[in-house]
Amino acid sequence: MKTRLLSAAVVASIATAPAVHSQTPVPSNNPSMRAALDMLKTDNTWTLQQQIELTQIPAPPFNESKRAAEYQRRLAALGLRNVHIDSVGNVIAERPGTGKGPTVVLAGHLDTVFPPGTNVTVHRNGTTLSAPGIGDDDRGLAVVLAVARAFQKSGIKTTGTVYFIGDVGEEGQGNLRGMRYLFGTEMKGKVDYFISVDDAGLGIASGAVGSNRYHVTYKGPGGHSYGAFGIPNPIHALGRAIAGIADIQVPTTPKTTFNVGVIQGGTSVNSISGSASMDIDMRSPDAKSLAEVNEKILRILHQALEAENARWPGPRAAAAKLTMTIDTIGIRPTGSQSDDAPIVKTALSAAHMLGFSTRTGASSTDANIPISLGIPGIRIGGGGEERGAHSLGESYVDTPNSYLGPQWAALIVAALAGVQ
């Protein structure tokens, strides 16, 4: 009974919140909405089981197909319409609206950061579940399923159409390829609001942290460390570049970062390597700051090449000059929204009435794409607690209020799409 009273209060608040004045309000006496919220609490075990089972289906970068097929099956089993996998691997399910209300997307990403062969067996210790990917983003996928199920079973009628999506390519070199495809083709011009459920917790990101990522390679003929001594060395050039990058000064606000995350090169201790490479990541929510650090890094890369080639005189060295290639492995757009934006105010109002507070921030997620296109979008957490994201020791804690994640997502979707 207490849950039903809380749900009614939440629904009433959302109905009158300034954030949704332009939307079809969620009526405070809507029994279907209250039933959906109650179900998401009482069926928390069901949601958790989806999370466990999906985690144990490997989904390495660019290899999400097995998990996608299972996700398609589960969405179809809920009775959603037009459930299909598009040409890049996104799983899309449609729940048609009753009128001409806003179109809302609720999405979680299928891919993980872990390579093929990673053991993804879930181990349970009390309320703690441990496995690579259990939080990022199998929690999000489970929440999307839970909300879709609650809407179906409670019989909620939304004015606008709601799409439930499991998308590919969110992580790393996936470069948001699933979202780029969706917003560039099948759903171009059709989406009014986008919500990504990514990771655990109850945070909200309304800003898009942009990033530039490069794979940089220095190449030369290489040779014996003693016999060929005196020719330019790709590893030395790489070292010069890394040292220069490490000394770059960046602003604290807006937070701007850089990182050399991977280095490769060399065959033996007594060889001058024929090549050396590194992967560089730089991030900022501000386009100007990102462009500035990008310019500094590119300058340093060229200076390192010139310095290493100039270091060694003579015709032998001149014939063995190094070259450099810079391959782009990821570009994520920046973007921002005011806290007064309807989608943000709706999310904050829903959180408040569910009894928790949260603050807006910025992150790099699927929401980057719609935000950069001027489409209102946010990333929210799926409830519970995540530890050790992107590590083999990743874990998810099923906290006493973890059901708030699915409830929050459901309220936001209902308020934005409108409920009859």
Regions found by a protein language model. Name each.
Residues 120-131, 219-223, 389-393:
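Glycine/charged-rich beta-loop-alpha catalytic/anionic-binding loops adjacent to active sites
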Residues 128, 133-211, 251, 270, ...:
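Acidic/histidine-rich catalytic neighborhood of metal-dependent amide-processing enzymes
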Residues 1-8:
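Bacterial N-terminal signal peptides that target proteins for export
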Residues 8-17:
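Bacterial N-terminal signal peptides
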Residues 49-102:
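A non-catalytic alpha/beta surface segment that caps or lines the substrate-entry region
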Residues 20-60, 208-210:
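N-terminal hydrophobic or amphipathic helices/low-complexity stretches enriched
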Residues 23-31, 35, 235-420:
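Metal-dependent amide/peptide-bond hydrolase catalytic core
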